[in-house]
């Protein structure tokens, strides 16, 4: 198992993992607000990777036997004018995507990915890390509470 920075040769596997993540979210979405748009697979990875690049972020991949089994994406959080009016706005990293393939969960891969992203955020002076998790994502909430 190794954690590496994203390389373009893994784009198709990243697309597959993001679809797996969205399918999971759809399966637990109590409000039925999520959807898997026909263009999701082809566009979401590109949009996520552009966001990472534009916002001083990183994408790390967990590789096992030359197969991508997990990924994490994170960026430097941006603030708008409203934020500055009522918030101190510390330098903050934001985890935007985290998925470990269902076949390889419960092996510590998610923690390895989080640790790698935490190292990166610390290296660029972030004081905090944020992540948004749907309230109905009990597995995700449980994972982050352990971190």
Regions inferred by a protein language model and the residue ranges of each:
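A short beta-loop-alpha structural element at the N-terminal edge
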Residues: 2-28
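Conserved GNAT-fold acetyl-CoA-binding loop/helix
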Residues: 23-47
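A short helix-loop-beta-strand connector motif used in the catalytic cores of GNAT acetyltransferases and
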Residues: 46-61, 94
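Conserved beta-strand in the GNAT
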Residues: 61, 67-76, 94, 99
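Conserved acetyl-CoA binding element of GNAT-fold acetyltransferases
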Residues: 83-102, 132
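Conserved acetyl-CoA-binding loop-helix of GNAT-fold acetyltransferases
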Residues: 97-100, 106-119, 145-146
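Conserved active-site alpha-helix within GNAT-family acetyltransferase domains
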Residues: 111, 123, 135-147
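Conserved GNAT acetyl-CoA-binding A-motif
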Residues: 114, 121-132
């Amino acid at each position: 198992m190794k954690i590496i920075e994203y390389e373009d040769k893994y784009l198709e596997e990243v697309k597959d993992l993001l679809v797996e993540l969205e399918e999971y979210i759809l399966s637990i979405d109590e409000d039925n607000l999520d959807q898997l748009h026909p263009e999701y697979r082809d566009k979401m990875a590109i949009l996520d990777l552009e966001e990472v690049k534009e916002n001083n972020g990183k994408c790390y991949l967990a590789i096992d036997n030359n197969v991508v089994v997990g990924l994490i994406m994170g960026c430097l959080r941006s603030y708008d004018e409203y934020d500055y009016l009522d918030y101190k706005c510390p330098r903050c990293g934001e985890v935007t995507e985290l998925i470990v393939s269902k076949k390889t969960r419960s092996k510590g891969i998610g923690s390895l990915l989080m640790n790698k992203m935490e190292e990166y955020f610390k290296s660029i002076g972030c004081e905090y890390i944020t992540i948004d998790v749907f309230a109905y994502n009990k597995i995700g909430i449980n994972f982050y509470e352990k971190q």
